[in-house]
Structure formats: structure tokens, C-alpha cells
Amino acid sequence: MLIPKRVKYRRQHRPTRSGISKGGNRVTFGEYGIQALEPAYITNRQIESARIAINRHVKRGGKVWINIFPDRPLTQKPLGVRMGSGKGPVEKWVANIKPGRILFEMSYPDEATALEALRRAGQKLPCKVRIVKREDQL
């Protein structure tokens, strides 16, 4: 699973989900990519699930780049606990995604297979996504 090795502060404030992505909006490594169309928190389990979906569909011959990392902790108090008495323990690690961000990139010789693999990966993610190609960008 993707989690940070070490953090300065164990518990952070929740990140804002407003605005658009300032960086990471272009396909730079591969030929095809998945671009987020709405804000979301993507957990380390969802990233891993999408990666496995891509790898199972293409088998061998391609390369996949994961452009996001879950570096923000989300805390949650246990069920049935009264208010107060401090912040709860870290429940999961999330990546704060804003619209326009490229989440995954991929290069593969066959275009139809690559687009189908990215479509399957997009179904595992909690936000609306679209598939973009490198040559579509200016």
C-alpha cells in the first residue's frame, strides 16, 4: 500500500477540495492518461485497485505511471464515542485531487487495449474521469 514513510505531524487538517489543479495537468511520461474532472479524495486502496485493473488487462509490454500519492491522513473517531477528548486516530491516507489532474499515465503499443485498460481503471476511482492522449494537448 502507498503510505508515507515518515510525516512531521501525525494528524493534519482536512485539505480543501475547491479550485482546479495548478500542476500535473499534462500527459508527460506515457502516451495516454486518466484526467480527473471533479474534486475527490482518492485513498491508497483505490489507487492500488486501479493499478491492478490496468495491469491485469494489458498483461505485459506496457508501462504504467502513477502520478498521485496519498500523503494526507484522514482521521475518524470510533463509532459510539462522545464528542470531545481529542482528535481520532488516522483512518486512511488520501490524495487530494482537484479537477484537471492527471492520475495515471500509460504507454502501450496497441491503442484500443490501452484505452480499455484505462477505462477499467477509471471505474475504480471515486470521481468522474476522462481519458486523454498526449497529442490532444497543445
Curated annotation (Swiss-Prot):
Part of the 50S ribosomal subunit. Pfam families: Ribosomal_L16. GO terms for molecular function: rRNA binding; structural constituent of ribosome; tRNA binding. Keywords: Ribonucleoprotein, Ribosomal protein, RNA-binding, rRNA-binding, tRNA-binding. GO terms for cellular component: cytosolic large ribosomal subunit. This is Large ribosomal subunit protein uL16. It comes from the Bacteria. Residues 1-23 are annotated as: Disordered. One of its GO terms (biological process) is translation. InterPro entries: Ribosomal_uL16, Ribosomal_uL16_bact-type, Ribosomal_uL16_CS, Ribosomal_uL16_dom, Ribosomal_uL16_sf. Residues 1-16 have a biased composition (Basic residues). Binds 23S rRNA and is also seen to make contacts with the A and possibly P site tRNAs. Belongs to the universal ribosomal protein uL16 family. SUPFAM superfamilies: Ribosomal protein L16p/L10e. PANTHER family: 50S/60S RIBOSOMAL PROTEIN L16 (PTHR12220), LARGE RIBOSOMAL SUBUNIT PROTEIN UL16M (PTHR12220:SF13).
